[in-house]
Amino acid sequence: GVVVTNVGDSRAYHITEDGITRITKDHSLVESMVDRGDITAEEARRHHSRNLITRALGPDISADCDGYICPMNAGEYLLLCSDGLVNTVTDQEMLFEVIHGDGPDTCLDRLLAIAKRQGAPDNVTAVLMQKQ
């Protein structure tokens, strides 16, 4: 498997032929609102406070991080991405591009193009790995 640690609102996704699963949990105001049932996940995508994070890396080297173990089989993918991608590309678009793409580099190019077309800021970052 793969060990993933996160803080803030960058995400990790496990992608297989069967679907896409978000591994990490955002440390954000809207994620807390979704957890409490105040808003839906879809409403969170458009919420005016969606970029307010409750934890972040900064000058203080000690950060309260969450850790996850993701079992992975050969041929499966791990996508690490910033909120610039998450806020503009849907999970289903990510799944489609990764599964039907032509290798990790081409998939990332297509995902970044979709994000730009949907109005993403310049700070869209993503890494896609396929387990051999």
PLM regions and their residue ranges:
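Solvent-exposed alpha-helices and their adjacent loops that cap or buttress functional pockets
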Residues: T5-N6, H14, R45-R46, C70-N73, ...
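Structural motif
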Residues: V3-T5, T21, N51, Y77-L79, ...
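A short local loop/turn or secondary-structure capping micro-motif enriched for an aromatic residue
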Residues: R11-H14, L29-M33, T88
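Short, glycine- and charge-enriched coil/turn segments that flank and shape catalytic ligand pockets
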Residues: E17-G19, G37-H47, I99-T106
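C-terminal catalytic subdomain
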Residues: R55-C81, L85-Q132
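ATP/adenylate-binding site constellation spanning eukaryotic-like Ser/Thr protein kinases
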Residues: V7, E17, D26, R50, ...
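Conserved catalytic micro-motifs used in adenylation/nucleotidyl-transfer and phosphoryl/amide-
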Residues: G1-T16, R22
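Conserved, helical-rich catalytic subdomain that frames metal- and/or nucleotide-binding sites
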Residues: K25-A74
